[in-house]
Amino acid sequence: ALAVALGCAPSAHAGRARAAAKPSTKARARRVAINPHITAPTDAAETAAVRYGRLSQDDCEAELNARAIEFTREDARGVLAPVRVASELHGVSFHTDEKPAARATSPYQIADCRLVLALDDFAAILERHGIVEVRHYSMYRPPHGWPDGKIGSRHDGALAIDAGRFVGDDGKVLDVDRDFHGAIGARTCGDGAGPRPSTPAAVELRAILCEAVDAHLFNVVLTPNYNRPHKNHFHLEVTAGVSWFLVH
């Protein structure tokens, strides 16, 4: 359903994605007109998400090394640049609720290198808010019956994370399910947006998310405002080869 809403194939090959990387002004306007939650800024090429989405595996890994991010290259079907991060990002750990021993080999801890760059930028925001841990449901979800050589998108391509809880250095937890306080169809960030009721936890959680939105770290940001299946997490995604942003 999301692919239809965005007007793109469920899993476009990287070559086709690159060809569509620079939509015309009219195409951008059509997308915005169809979905008010989509924006297509004229300076999209300069944004973090778009720049990261265009990186090759080697160039992306070189950037991880330049940032002193420890990682190992993984083998993951459908993923262009699969890695397993071995270090915290700006003092923030991103992990599932699996036991530490299980995380070491869990496919859900594999991420495309380009997502890791976006998460590293996001971690800088989290650090300012005193967040030291992000508990997520998954990044990579191994696809079934996947053709050899096909590059995936979203979770199939390890380009998305479903973040459910944010743990502070004081032990307090911002829980998306409990603290987001949104409504399906409501605006997530910007004028007129905000949690109802605006409890301190809800305000802090919304501030964290909307700082990431303002920084254009992810092409797709889906929240409990999008639909019921997203009631307990933020879906944060780098979408390769596009120059639009969906926030809902």
Task: State what each model feature region is.
Residues 7-9, 59-61, 112-114, 188-190, ...:
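Sequence contexts marking disulfide-bonded cysteines in secreted/extracellular proteins
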Residues 1-70:
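N-terminal secretory targeting signals
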Residues 109-136, 142-173:
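Mid-length scaffold segments of soluble, non-membrane domains
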